[in-house]
């Protein structure tokens, strides 16, 4: 993985390199990911420029290494964008530790992935709330915070989040560690009213670090 990432953790539903691209964004090469069935870029290989809701439908038993050439992506543990989610920014992911980072959750392969289209590192704003439904103490952020408590947030919990622009990845623990939650302006209108909106696998509202997604 790159040192930059270490400093921070109507169209067809999917398309491989043999399928036509259907948008200006894709025709400009905005998104491209290469996946392999085995670790260290071995075994069956395919390139994608659009979402893939089920890698098994493309002949893969699993995906165990990845190279992101353009754009940020999200990888999911299960088909149809289910299970734990992992941010995939530009760079090499030769094995599962590369995308899971310091997560306590061991996910050795991925089975679906999609693009993050609203990421804008230079224009990202998010508001954190103490209580559900955007109530209680709030704090607006425009930068990366490896420790929310060091920044002044008084709790280990963030009960609701409103993404005003860009895309963010929130982490369970300080230092961009633990479970990852991808928060996007163009999903759910940027409104995450309770912690179960963060992810289908979110078990609590514990969030202690957050950063902008690179694009």
Spell out what each predicted region is.
Residues 1-215:
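Compact beta-sheet-dominated domain cores in extracellular/mature segments
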């Amino acid at each position: 993985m790159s040192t930059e990432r270490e400093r921070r953790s109507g169209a067809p539903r999917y398309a491989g390199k043999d399928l036509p691209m259907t948008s200006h964004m894709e025709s400009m090469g905005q998104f491209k990911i290469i996946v392999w069935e085995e670790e260290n870029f071995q075994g069956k290989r395919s390139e994608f420029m659009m979402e893939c809701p089920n890698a098994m439908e493309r002949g893969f038993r699993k995906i165990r290494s990845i190279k992101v050439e353009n754009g940020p992506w999200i990888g999911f543990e299960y088909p149809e964008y289910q299970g734990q989610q992992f941010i995939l920014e530009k760079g090499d992911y030769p094995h599962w530790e590369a995308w899971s980072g310091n997560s306590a959750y061991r996910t050795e392969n991925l089975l679906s992935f999609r693009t993050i289209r609203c990421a804008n590192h230079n224009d990202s704003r998010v508001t954190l709330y103490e209580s559900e439904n955007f109530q209680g103490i709030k704090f607006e952020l425009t930068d990366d915070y490896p420790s929310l408590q060091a920044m002044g947030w008084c709790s280990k919990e963030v009960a609701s989040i409103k993404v005003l622009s860009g895309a963010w990845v929130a982490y369970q623990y300080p230092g961009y560690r633990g479970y990852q939650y991808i928060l996007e302006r163009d999903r759910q209108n940027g409104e995450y009213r309770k912690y179960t909106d963060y992810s289908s696998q979110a078990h609590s509202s514990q969030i202690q670090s957050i950063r902008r997604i690179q694009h």
